[in-house]
């Protein structure tokens, strides 16, 4: 019989709580510091992303609570446990540079979600698995759209 809601799943979800918290700060940073062509369109898009990934973070934390885990809840814990890294804004960046950084973080999340999908499938945790599949599908679409903005193919 498969083990459902194992320590591995709880650790994975908690890692994503940390990642998503750091990522939402990065999105805000892009939102505040962007300049140049497509400002109005991308500024609004960052609002949408901030909301979407804030909701993802909340869903992941609530799923973790539902399976008996304890989500990280301090800035120190987020920074110590995230693979998404802070990106201090020390000098102006072009819109393309900001979008490249955003895509890089989305790709990191996509790859980690893929690992989580495999883990939860192996463990038979269908609820967490379905949640991660839906989140990964959204991330895949964002990667495609931002790469198109940058004039790149989705798998480039």
UniProtKB/Swiss-Prot annotation:
Descriptive protein name: DNA protection during starvation protein
This protein's domain notes: 12 di-nuclear ferroxidase centers are located at the interfaces between subunits related by 2-fold symmetry axes.
Single GO molecular function: ferric iron binding
PROSITE patterns to which the protein is assigned, alphabetical: DPS_1, DPS_2
Function: Protects DNA from oxidative damage by sequestering intracellular Fe(2+) ion and storing it in the form of Fe(3+) oxyhydroxide mineral. One hydrogen peroxide oxidizes two Fe(2+) ions, which prevents hydroxyl radical production by the Fenton reaction. Does not bind DNA.
Oligomer and partners: Homododecamer. The 12 subunits form a hollow sphere into which the mineral iron core of up to 500 Fe(3+) can be deposited.
Main location as per UniProt: cytoplasm
Effect upon mutating residue 31 to G: Slight decrease in DNA protection and significant decrease in iron affinity. Retains only one third of wild-type DNA protection and loses iron binding ability
UniProt induction comment: By iron limitation and stationary growth phase.
InterPro entries referenced in this protein's UniProt entry, alphabetically: DPS_DNA-bd, DPS_DNA-bd_CS, Ferritin-like, Ferritin-like_SF, Ferritin_DPS_dom
Gene Ontology biological-process entries: intracellular iron ion homeostasis
EC numbers for this chain: 1.16.-.-
Species in which this protein is naturally found: Listeria innocua serovar 6a (strain ATCC BAA-680 / CLIP 11262)
Compartments, as annotated in UniProt: Cytoplasm
Catalytic activity from the UniProt record: 2 Fe(2+) + H2O2 + 2 H(+) = 2 Fe(3+) + 2 H2O
Higher taxonomy: Bacteria, Bacillati, Bacillota, Bacilli, Bacillales
Residues noted as binding Fe cation 1 in the record, renumbered to the chain: 31, 58, 62
Residues annotated as binding Fe cation 2: 62
Family membership: Belongs to the Dps family.
Gene Ontology terms: cellular component: cytoplasm
Keywords associated with the record: Cytoplasm, Iron, Iron storage, Metal-binding, Oxidoreductase
């Amino acid at each position: 019989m498969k083990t459902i809601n194992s320590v591995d799943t709880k650790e994975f979800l908690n890692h994503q709580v940390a990642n998503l918290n750091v990522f939402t700060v990065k999105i805000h940073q892009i939102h505040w510091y962007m300049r140049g062509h497509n400002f109005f369109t991308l500024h609004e898009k960052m609002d949408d992303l901030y909301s979407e990934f804030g909701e993802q973070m909340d869903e992941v934390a609530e799923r973790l609570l539902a399976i008996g885990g304890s989500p990280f809840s301090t800035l120190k814990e987020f920074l110590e446990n995230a693979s998404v890294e802070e990106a201090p804004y020390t000098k102006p960046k072009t819109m393309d540079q900001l979008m490249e950084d955003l895509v890089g973080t989305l790709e990191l999340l996509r790859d980690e979600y893929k690992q989580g999908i495999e883990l939860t499938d192996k463990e038979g945790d269908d609820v967490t698995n379905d949640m991660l599949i839906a989140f990964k599908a959204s991330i895949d679409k964002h990667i495609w759209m931002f790469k198109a903005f940058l004039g790149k193919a989705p798998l480039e």
